[in-house]
Amino acid sequence: GTLPCGESCVWIPCISAAVGCSCKSKVCYKN
């Protein structure tokens, strides 16, 4: 929840979810 993964999730899910990122406020974050 604190480290941006450099990916947005406005239209599609986080591809970086594979490495533990999740969508928050239209941006993918890790932890």
Curated annotation (Swiss-Prot):
PROSITE patterns: CYCLOTIDE, CYCLOTIDE_BRACELET. There is a cross-link at G1-N31 (Cyclopeptide (Gly-Asn)). The keyword Disulfide bond applies. The lineage of its organism: Eukaryota, Viridiplantae, Streptophyta, Embryophyta, Tracheophyta. The presence of a 'disulfide through disulfide knot' structurally defines this protein as a knottin. GO terms for biological process: defense response. The keyword Disulfide bond applies. Keywords: Disulfide bond, Knottin, Plant defense. Disulfide bonds join C5-C21, C9-C23, C14-C28. It comes from the Eukaryota. InterPro entries: Cyclotide, Cyclotide_bracelet_CS, Cyclotide_sf. Belongs to the cyclotide family. Bracelet subfamily. This is Cycloviolacin-O6. Pfam families: Cyclotide. It comes from Viola odorata (Sweet violet).
